[in-house]
C-alpha cells in the first residue's frame, strides 16, 4: 500500500568510512508512516564480501563487527550487493512511490555515499533530500543541551537496531525539541 507520505528509514554497516575502498556489509530498512509508526521492516541483509576485504578492516571495524557476529555472517552470506539492492527496491516500492521519501536515519549521508557507488538504483529511488536525525541532535546540543543529553543511545552497530534507535530518537526530538503546532494535512 504505497503512500507518498510514508518514510523509509535505512541503516548500513560498512567495512570502513571510505566508499572508494570500503564496502557495504549489512543493510536493513523500516517503513514508517508520517507519525513514525512502524508499518513494515525488511529482512536484515548481510552482504557477502571477500575474506581479503574483511581481513583488512581497521581495528574499530574488526572489533565491532566481530563482537556483533556480523563479520562471520558476511563471510557465510550468499547475498551480493546487486541482489540486496533489488530486494530492497522491491520492498520499498510496495510502500513508497519512487522519489517520494527522503532517506531517513542517523548520519544518513554516509550511507548515501556508499549507495551511490554500490547500489545506485536504490539511491535513485529515494528523494534527493535526507531526513537526518543527526541534524536535530546537533541543534539540540547547541540550543537545548538537556534535550540532547536525555537521549539514550545503545549504539549496537547492527542495522535494524540502529534504525529502530533512530526512529525512537526522532520521536524524542519531536516530543521534547520541536515546537508543536496544529497538524495540517500533508500535501
Swiss-Prot record:
CDD domains in UniProt: Orn
Protein keywords: Cytoplasm, Exonuclease, Hydrolase, Nuclease
InterPro entries cross-referenced by the UniProt entry: Exonuclease_RNaseT/DNA_pol3, Oligoribonuclease, RNaseH-like_sf, RNaseH_sf
Domain Exonuclease: 7-170
A single MF term (Gene Ontology): nucleic acid binding
Entry annotated with the keyword Chaperone: no
Protein name as it appears in the record: Oligoribonuclease
Superkingdom of origin organism: Bacteria
Function comment: 3'-to-5' exoribonuclease specific for small oligoribonucleotides.
Organism in which the protein naturally occurs: Neisseria meningitidis serogroup C / serotype 2a (strain ATCC 700532 / DSM 15464 / FAM18)
Active-site residues, record numbering mapped to chain: 128
Gene Ontology biological-process annotations: DNA metabolic process
Subcellular location: Cytoplasm
Enzyme class: hydrolase
Highest classification ranks of the organism: Bacteria, Pseudomonadati, Pseudomonadota, Betaproteobacteria, Neisseriales
Family statement drawn from the similarity comment of this UniProt entry: Belongs to the oligoribonuclease family.
SMART domains linked to this entry: EXOIII
CC annotations in GO: cytoplasm
Pfam families noted in UniProt: RNase_T
Database matches in NCBIfam families: PRK05359.1 (NF003765)
EC number(s) reported in the record: 3.1.15.-
Entry keyword annotation includes Acyltransferase: no
Amino acid at each position: 500500500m504505497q503512500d507518498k507520505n510514508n518514510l523509509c528509514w535505512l541503516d548500513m554497516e560498512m567495512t570502513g568510512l571510505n566508499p572508494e575502498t570500503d564496502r557495504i556489509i549489512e543493510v536493513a530498512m523500516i517503513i514508517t508512516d508520517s507519525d513514525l509508526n512502524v508499518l513494515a521492516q525488511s529482512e536484515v541483509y548481510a552482504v557477502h564480501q571477500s575474506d581479503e576485504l574483511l581481513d583488512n578492516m581497521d581495528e574499530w571495524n574488526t572489533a565491532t563487527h566481530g563482537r556483533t557476529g556480523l563479520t562471520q555472517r558476511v563471510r557465510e552470506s550468499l547475498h551480493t550487493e546487486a541482489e540486496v539492492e533489488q530486494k530492497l527496491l522491491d520492498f520499498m516500492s510496495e510502500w513508497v512511490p519512487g522519489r517520494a521519501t527522503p532517506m531517513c536515519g542517523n548520519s544518513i549521508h554516509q550511507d548515501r555515499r556508499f549507495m551511490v557507488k554500490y547500489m545506485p538504483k536504490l539511491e535513485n529511488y529515494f528523494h534527493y533530500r535526507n531526513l537526518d536525525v543527526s541534524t536535530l541532535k546537533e541543534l539540540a546540543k547547541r540550543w537545548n543541551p538537556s534535550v540532547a543529553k536525555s537521549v539514550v543511545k545503545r549504539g549496537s552497530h547492527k542495522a535494524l537496531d540502529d534504525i529502530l534507535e533512530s526512529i525512537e530518537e526522532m520521536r524524542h526530538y519531536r516530543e521534547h525539541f520541536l515546537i508543536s503546532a496544529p497538524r495540517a494535512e500533508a500535501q
